[in-house]
UniProtKB/Swiss-Prot annotation:
This is DNA-directed RNA polymerase subunit beta'. GO terms for molecular function: DNA binding; DNA-directed RNA polymerase activity; magnesium ion binding; zinc ion binding. It comes from Campylobacter jejuni subsp. jejuni serotype O:23/36 (strain 81-176). Belongs to the RNA polymerase beta' chain family. Transmembrane segments: none annotated. SMART domains: RPOLA_N (SM00663). Its cofactor is Mg(2+); Zn(2+). Its EC number is 2.7.7.6. It holds the Pfam family RNA_pol_Rpb1_5. Zn(2+) 2 binds at residues 812, 886, 893, 896. Binds 1 Mg(2+) ion per subunit. Disulfide bonds: none annotated. The gene is rpoC.
Length: 1517
């Protein structure tokens, strides 16, 4: 860093050009130099004259005059005496503002400790002296002595225990030692003075060296910790002047004795005001009371000392002085808070700056501004996109100064006074001038809560009558505004720069896209959607159907003359082609720009289609075209919604006729289940789950039935159906509550009540049903209130951690990236690869899997078209650049960030991407929370998965899969992990019989086949192959990766497939549970109907080696018999448009070289209609099966002790159920003793039902027991927000799973201290040991192979573990997919890059493992930037650099650990941050946003980046 000069700030100066801000401890001399005089008296003002008392807390002589340029006695008045000191009253004539900056001081008779350095952990004074905080307090509060000079003193008579320097003694010990060793130089004292002397005598450099030696000498971790604590404080003191200029007097480092106060500074009086209220009372700032007590006690102490009072009285007075100063600095930190007259604690200096009402957050980060007003909003449908209606009354006030100037300029008024009078009388000239002033002067509108940047937008005002602001209907979505009484604030930009920014950057017509997702935010909603939907509908047999019209004018004439219905199907010419459309759609076409293709408008337009249309117009046409198009769309929508005259009537709500039948059927099923529960055939959990499933499916059937009826009603013109179908208002779920049945409800705790509400709202609810309904409704409202606060807090934390992230350079030049693929949860796709790659820059070439040529080169920016090509090419994973891998020194580079979603272009340097990201994640947080009650508390849980089935075609490969055959001859999965069933298609087939060989060379894998005569080699890229841990489902995804079914040295037949492409995979544990039944064989083909997907000519091929050979004799009706059969669809230029693999047993539906047109044509068909089921299992229970034949014995399973007996009444069978709560140390276990000494143990979880008896003989794969899965809870969004904040806070979960750190084989060792010991042994001989609590359920078996990152026990994976074991890229994948699951599950689209920006901030600190020669200490958390700079400095000097490991900090910790002092202090834990910074003399280089806002400077992003540089604007030709 460069050296800085310290600026002396003059009294009235407002320096703009300072570059840094440093916090330091103030020396007593410094405090004196600030002071303008000593405050000697506790008086404030004279109650009669109301003038400040001399030498008092408000003294004018010390602090300056009360009135501008006027001394207290009135001898000197006016400017011309500036700087004169009055002889009579001693007041200097000056501006009264100096009372805000001039300080005084109080000379304390005895040094007093500053409470921040005593009481905030770790206690700085205590640490330096090596004294415990409690002991230090006893010394300071005169309860104990501290040894200043031990002399030759010993504690015991035998002289073995020596008295050490800084030992703390009680009264008795002190008297004892004094008697015996007074002459040997023993000396101990108590109180502030001795502590100050001890601190003054410290030689920090010597102490530092001594501590370093001790550190090197010790082996105990605990000792190391305490030494490191002391080292940190000592180093902070020594380094506290590193950046000061050596020639200035500021270069002295902080001294420890400055933590003791001898001169107490007094705050300028105007910062602790005393205001006269009417009625002769005064409102006083609490600080004055606290100062008064200090002064009183100080003067009393002075008097007592002059009188030579007894020691005990003086001590008491000194203690009281210490307490008074403590209270002034931080009241209530120690002991009880000092209370004022009204029995509430006084607000001390610390309280004034911290918290929401403190100086930082209340007055510095957010200020009230002038030229603003607020009013209620109403809709302004006639406005243009960039206009708002401003009430004349408001405009008159807001633009008053402009208006006064205008009136004078026009000559209507000669003086300001006259102009003011005109405005008061509201003459005609005033209105005329107001129109002119307002023209071309934009205003900003803001709706609280301001959750993202679109909550403040600029508009051109249009003056309107009335008192309400008019708002354009399309910008409501961005503001989240509606017209039920919302209010908005208006702000007037004043400077020319501000006005220019409003016009160029903030106009609402410029902000069409959401920065969170890049989707358009100005999409028509509600009435507008309804109107456009109505207009685009088609009605069979409407008036004038099948007519031919030349164009829109003819259609309009026909409509006017009533010979054509708006919904009639007509034919017309568009772009030289004859098309069939409707009259209404032609009207829509007439407002569209010419470049919109027919398939975008010639269909029924629902809300999603309209949104897609707006997006398309924006992408193709740009801002101006889109803005005017949106206005036309809005007008059209409103017009036809009005003309349609859609209304709601009770006749629109149609109840299905067979509702009662369905309900009776469901009730019958429920009775059956209840009976089988009573007979003991199923557990209570199963009963509950099954009943809920029955009612769910009944509800679904009824809803579907009802929707069909409503849809058919009035030929699709049923009002309610139109509203829901168009997306204008309501949903199918809500209609089904109106017309089918209300369904299952939830209790306030989120569990589902098993009796549903059978009535619907049309029939009406009975009393019980109504009562159950209220639960859900009430819960929704309560949740909303609670969660809004949480979401707001999350946003604040995110903003704080990300505020300093901005785009600094174009390209950081890194080649590193992160591999991404689609995010899936279970079997549903959460986010496709196409969505994830949009707007990102590639970090590696993308290779086309079919042609093996480079599809896109490294460094390509993926726009919509490229992303689409990529999506269609069948590529499953891509390497992209991300903020996490960016190597820019500060901030992020544009290439690693990608497209700025708000503009759709590559981001420019200076963009505040951190803030945008935080807003994008936080804003839907509040949305999520506010959305709970819309479904009225009706329950929603997905039907539980009972099976997996193949969605694609290919053939089956078992990876590591072992199965058992049970008595029924079924195949049962025997693996618990590290196995999978893959669906593959062949990529390379063997040209001849031979031996396979596989070798790894650098980035390539070479597969070769060899027989006696010949050898062929195939080269594959290493990262295209699926890794073992990916196949096992530990990390990453395997779709599209390559799989090698054979190992080196195996013999392979001719035409066998040796390299395969994985199309789908189901790994054991995550997708296929243990003990599932497998319904496919290894190598079995899976046949689906294959659709063409493109139009063109069919060509059939067969795979030979790694190339395709043409097969021409294929006819319709052939059955494929051979592996490796492909069909290619060639387009008109004979290029390959699409390629499909056709598995064996498929039936070909076309001849070779035949032309096909439609994309949905089936080329090859499957013999069976339904999808191929891969595996099935019990949906309600986890099954435990026997792994060997043998005899069962029970351990710790005893009826009435650890288990309960249940008797089945019908059959008389007894079964044991493990109790839910077990005594400690009791672990119910089933043991199977097999042949020889083979034994297998099964530890049982609570609630497990046991199906065997002690001593039973059993066979392999028999069912031993079942554990019910947890009862289904309704998915409320609560999972959402707390989950997101848990991830961002990187909290260690309560029930964290123990994770394997290395790949290897599991071994169980002897239990240690009632904990299980698991050892993992790797192939290379390393091993890792884990001790696991007995309460945890272990999920691995002895002898199993496990991958790093897999869970050993049940529980939640902690993100810290992911980072530690699998590294930063795996953490990136984990956090993003977890967070996206929450948001996508709620239908909220957020681009990954926003989450990545936050994650990169959570990883911005590293933990020093080895300090080398640097100034760091091991265990330090330092920012990567500081770490890098320090290492570079040490390397330049030829020293050892430090080594560090990455750490993941939660957003709160990361924000407090900010490099900027001001920013950290204004976030949380203000006192702690300031204490630390002052000792270390920390610098704040004012690089980020927050600290500049606080100091009132331009923020260094966007246009503020160019700050003081003079910009020249030139007009475009």
């Amino acid at each position: 860093m460069s050296k800085f000069k310290v600026i002396e700030i003059k009294e009235d100066a407002r320096p703009r050009d300072f570059e840094a801000f440093q916090l330091r401890l103030a020396s007593p001399e410094k405090i004196k130099s600030w002071s303008y005089g000593e405050v000697k008296k506790p008086e404030t003002i004279n109650y009669r004259t109301l003038k400040p008392e001399r030498d008092g807390l408000f003294c004018a002589k010390i602090f300056g005059p009360i009135r501008d340029y006027e001394c207290l006695c009135g001898k000197y008045k006016k400017m011309r005496f500036k700087g004169v000191k009055c002889e009579k009253c001693g007041v200097e004539v000056a501006n009264s503002k100096v009372r805000r900056s001039r300080m005084g001081h109080i000379e304390l008779v005895t040094p007093v400790a500053h409470i921040w350095y005593v009481n905030s952990l770790p206690s700085r004074i205590g640490t330096l002296l090596g004294v415990k905080m409690k002991d230090l307090e006893r010394v300071l509060y005169y309860e104990a002595y501290i040894v200043e000079n031990p002399g030759d003193a010993f504690y015991d008579n035998e002289s073995t225990k020596k008295v050490e320097y800084c030992d703390v003694l009680n009264e008795e010990q002190y008297q004892n030692l004094m008697q015996r060793y007074e002459n040997s130089g023993f000396k101990a004292r108590m109180g502030g003075e001795v502590v100050r002397d001890l601190l003054a005598n410290l030689d920090l450099v010597a102490l530092l060296n001594q501590l370093k030696e001790e550190m090197a000498a010790t082996n105990s971790e605990a000792k190391k910790k305490t030494i490191i604590k002391r080292l940190k404080v000592v180093e902070n003191f020594l380094n506290s002047n590193l950046n000061a200029n050596t020639d200035s007097d500021e270069a002295v480092p902080n001294r420890p004795e400055w933590m003791m106060i001898t001169n107490l500074p007094v705050l300028p009086p105007d910062l602790r005001p005393l205001v006269a209220l009417d009625g002769g009372k005064f409102a006083v700032s609490d600080v004055n009371d606290l100062y008064r007590r200090v002064i009183n006690r100080n003067t009393r102490l002075k008097k007592l000392m002059e009188l030579d009072a007894p020691e005990i009285i003086i001590r008491n007075e000194k203690r009281m002085l210490q307490e008074a100063v403590d209270a002034l600095f931080d009241n209530g930190r120690r002991a009880n808070a000092v209370k004022g007259a009204n029995k509430r604690p006084l607000k001390s200096l610390s309280e004034i700056i911290k918290g929401k009402q403190g100086r930082f957050r209340q007055n510095l980060l957010g200020k009230r501004v002038d030229f603003s007003g607020r009013s209620v909003i109403v809709v302004g449908p006639k406005l243009r996109m960039d206009q708002c209606g401003l009430p004349k009354k408001m405009a008159l006030e807001l633009f008053k100064p402009h208006l006064l100037a205008k009136l004078e300029e026009k000559g209507y008024a000669t003086t300001v006074k006259q102009a003011k009078k005109m405005i008061e009388n509201k003459t005609n000239e005033v209105w005329e001038c107001l129109e002119e002033v307002v023209k071309g002067h934009p205003v900003m509108l803001n709706r609280a809560p301001t959750l993202h940047k679109l909550s403040i937008q600029a508009f051109h005002p249009v003056l309107v009558e009335g008192k309400a602001i008019q708002l354009h209907p399309l910008v409501c979505a961005a503001f989240n505004a509606d017209f039920d009484g919302d209010q908005m604030a208006v702000h007037v930009p004043l400077s020319q720069e501000a006005i220019a920014e409003c016009k160029v950057l903030m106009l609402s017509s410029m902000n069409i896209l959401l920065p969170a997702s890049g989707k358009s935010v100005t999409v028509p909603s509600q009435d507008m959607v309804l109107g456009i939907y109505y207009l685009s509908l088609e009605k069979a047999g409407a008036k004038g159907s099948h007519k031919i019209c030349t164009g829109i004018d003819e259609v309009m004439m026909a409509l006017e003359s009533k010979c054509l219905d708006i919904h009639a199907s007509i034919q017309t010419m568009v772009d030289g082609r004859k098309i069939t459309t409707t009259a209404g759609r032609l009207i829509i076409k007439s407002i569209l720009p010419d470049f919109v293709p027919e398939n975008s408008w010639n269909k029924v337009l629902k809300k999603k289609d309209i949104a897609a249309l707006v997006d398309y117009v924006y992408k193709q046409g740009g801002l101006e075209i889109t803005a005017s198009f949106l206005d036309r769309l809005k007008n059209l929508g409103f017009e036809y919604a009005t003309k349609a005259g859609i209304s709601i009537s009770i006749a629109d709500i149609i109840v299905p006729n067979d509702k009662q039948k369905a309900i009776d059927e469901a009730k019958k099923q429920v009775r059956e289940i209840q009976n089988s529960y009573n007979l003991g055939l199923i557990t209570s959990g199963e009963r509950y789950n099954k009943i809920i499933d029955i009612w769910k499916s009944t509800n679904n059937v009824l809803s579907k039935e009802m929707m069909k009826l409503v849809e058919k009603d009035k030929e699709g013109f049923n009002s309610i159906y139109m509203m829901a179908d168009s997306g204008a208002r309501g949903s199918a779920a809500q209609i089904s509550q109106l017309a089918a049945m209300r369904g299952l409800m939830t209790k306030p705790d989120g569990s589902i009540i098993e009796t549903p509400i059978i009535s619907n709202f049309r029939e009406g609810l009975n009393v019980l049903e109504y009562f159950i309904s209220t639960h859900g409704a009430r819960k929704g409202l309560a949740d909303t209130a609670l969660k809004t606060a949480n979401a707001g807090y999350l946003t604040r934390k995110l903003i704080d951690v990300a505020q300093n992230v901005k785009i600094t350079i174009e390209d950081c030049g890194t080649h590193e990236g992160v591999e991404i693929n689609e995010i899936t949860a279970d079997s549903s796709i959460i986010e496709t690869l196409e969505e994830r790659i949009l707007g990102r820059v590639l970090a590696e070439d993308v290779i086309d899997p079919i042609t093996n040529s480079v599809l896109f080169a490294e460094g390509t920016l993926m726009d919509e078209e490229k992303a689409k090509i990529l999506g269609e090419s069948g590529i499953k994973s891509v390497n992209i650049r991300t903020p996490i891998t960016c190597k820019a020194k500060k901030g992020i580079c544009a290439k690693c960030y990608g497209i700025n979603l708000g503009e759709g272009k590559l981001v420019k340097p200076g963009e505040a991407v951190g803030i945008v990201s935080a807003q994008s994640i936080g804003e839907p947080g509040t949305q999520l929370t506010l959305r709970t009650f819309h479904s009225g508390g009706t329950a929603s849980t997905d039907l539980q998965d009972r099976q997996v089935s193949a969605q694609k075609e290919g053939f089956i490969r078992f990876y590591n899969l072992k199965t058992y055959k049970n008595k029924e001859g079924k195949n049962i999965v025997a693996n618990r992990r590290n196995a999978a069933i893959l669906l593959v298609e062949p990529k390379i087939k063997t040209p001849f019989k031979g031996v396979i060989n596989i070798e790894n060379i650098h980035e390539d894998v070479i597969v070769s086949i060899k027989d006696k005569k010949q050898e062929v080699k195939y080269i594959l890229r290493k990262y295209d192959l699926a890794k073992p841990n990916e196949l096992a489902g530990v990390s990453g995804s395997i779709d599209g990766k390559l799989y090698l079914p054979y190992q080196s040295g195996m013999q392979v037949e001719e035409n066998e497939s040796i390299v395969e492409v994985i199309k789908e995979g189901w790994n054991v544990l995550n997708r296929i549970p243990f003990a599932s039944e497998i319904l496919v064989e290894d190598g079995e083909p899976v046949v689906q109907n294959i659709k063409a997907g493109e139009k063109g000519t069919l060509k059939f091929y067969i795979l030979k080696g790694d190339g395709l050979d043409r097969v021409k004799n294929v006819k319709k009706g052939d059955i494929v018999k051979e592996k490796g059969f492909f069909v290619v669809i060639a387009d008109e230029n004979d290029r390959e448009a699409k390629r499909h693999y056709i598995p064996r047993e498929s039936k070909i539906e076309f001849n070779d070289s035949e032309k096909i047109d439609d994309a949905n044509t089936i080329i090859a068909s499957a013999p069976k209609k339904e999808r191929k089921v891969i595996a099935e299992w019990d949906a309600y229970n986890n099954t435990i099966i026997a792994e060997i034949d043998g005899v069962v014995s029970f351990e710790d399973i005893e009826a009435g002790y650890s288990a309960d007996e249940q008797i089945d009444e019908a059959t008389g069978k007894r079964s044991l159920v493990i109790n839910e709560y077990l005594p400690s140390g009791v672990r119910p276990t089933l043991v199977i003793a097999g042949k020889g000494d083979k034994a297998v143990r099964y530890q049982l979880e609570p609630k497990t039902v046991i199906f065997v008896h002690d001593g039973d003989k059993i066979a392999q794969a028999d069912i031993l027991a079942k554990t019910p899965k947890a009862a289904a809870k309704s998915k409320d969004i609560t999972g959402g927000l707390p989950r997101v904040s848990e991830l961002f806070e990187a909290r260690k979960p309560k029930n964290a799973a123990v994770i394997a750190e290395i790949d290897g084989v599991v071994r169980f060792d002897k239990p240690l201290r009632s904990k299980e010991r698991i050892i993992i042994q790797a192939e290379d001989g390393t091993s890792a040991e884990y001790l696991i609590d007995k309460s945890k359920h272990i999920q691995v078996r002895d002898g199993e192979f496990i991958h790093a990152g897999e869970k050993l026990t049940d529980g939640v994976v902690s993100s810290h573990d992911v980072l530690k074991i699998l590294g930063e890229k795996a953490l990136h994948y984990y956090l993003i997919s977890e967070i996206q699951q929450v948001y996508r599950g709620q239908g909220v689209v957020i681009s990954d890059k926003h989450i990545e920006v936050i994650v990169s901030q959570m990883l911005r600190q590293v933990k020093v493992v080895d300090s080398g020669h640097t100034k760091f200490i091991e265990g330090d958390l330092v920012s990567r930037r500081k770490f890098r700079e320090e290492n570079e400095r040490i390397i330049r000097m030829g020293g050892e650099p430090a080594i560090a490991e990455p750490v993941l900090l939660g957003v709160t910790r990361a924000a407090i650990g900010s490099d900027s002092v001001i920013s950290a202090a204004s976030f949380q834990e203000t006192t702690k941050v300031l204490t630390e910074a002052s000792i270390a003399g920390k610098f704040d280089y004012l690089e980020d946003l927050k600290e500049n806002v606080i100091l009132g400077r331009m923020i260094p992003v966007g246009t503020g980046l160019y700050g003081e540089q003079n910009l020249k604007l030139k007009e475009q030709e």
